[in-house]
Amino acid sequence: MNKLGIFVNFWEKSWTINYPYYIDKVARLGYDILEFQAQPLLEIDDAKLRAIKKHADDAGIKLSYSLGLNPKYDVANPDDAIRAGGVEYLQNIVRKIAVMEGELFSGVTYAGWGVPSYFVDAAEKERLFARSVDSMQKVMTVAEREGVTVCCEAVNRFESPLVNTAAEAIRYADAVNSKCIGIHLDTYHMNIEENSIGDAIRLVGSRLRHFHTGENNRNVPGRGHLDWDEIFSALAEIGYKRDIVSEPFLQMGDEVGYDIRVWRDILENPTEERLDAEAAFLLDFTKGYLKKYGM
């Protein structure tokens, strides 16, 4: 069975978290993986990172790393200095993940998270693409040395103009042309951008390195209108054996609610107890589909 995880900001409304607390929580709930934003790792010394990794190992929890790249480190930016700073920033994150013996780093890694402040037409999108690929190839020199796969996540049009679909993710990975570039798909984003989620999964096929689940409105899978039979049957068809991490965002407020654009509590009265109950429902829901499709 695929290892199953949950994104820590299901509970936490800050990107900076109490790692041991949430490691223990997801272990008690029965998950295999805790995923969180990677950028706070840059502020933690290596000894403490190794202690966090040991705590996770002792709890039987795998750690997974994600990122929405701050625009001030935009590796696709027209400004040479911004791109160079972004390359160094991503390389340093890869090094920190390697300290924790991490294998994979995903998310909006290829450009600043969000829509650029300047106009993007078809010609500018090609220039964005070329600049990003050149930058990512420099990141790959460190990723290959450290043995960390960096995934490009196809996200919706409101979060990036560069990689919105599975086909665009494939084109990007082909251009970077490294053993350490991967493709990351997310059902929330695919629901917005793809004509068929199942076809998008099949198009990526064996190149799919990371997979996020979330409902049409950022809710817990099973609480919205996505066709989970279509999704899991496609994953089974391509023989997907890698991690599946759920990434619901249910709470408004603070930096996470603002950055994700959650303008209401999607779960009414989201106390920690209610969130824990939803996390338990989510785990059972996902395991049910894995069993149904022999995964």
Report residues per predicted region.
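Conserved, mostly hydrophobic/aromatic
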Residues: 26, 34, 56, 86, ...
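Active-site acidic/histidine proton-transfer and metal-coordination neighborhood
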Residues: 57-58, 80-182, 269, 273-276, ...
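Catalytic-core regions built around general acid/base machinery
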Residues: 47-60, 135-143, 200, 230-234
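N-terminal pre-domain/capping segments
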Residues: 1-103, 126, 178, 264-295
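Structural preference for beta-strand elements that scaffold enzyme active sites
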Residues: 3-5, 33-35, 60-65, 102-106, ...
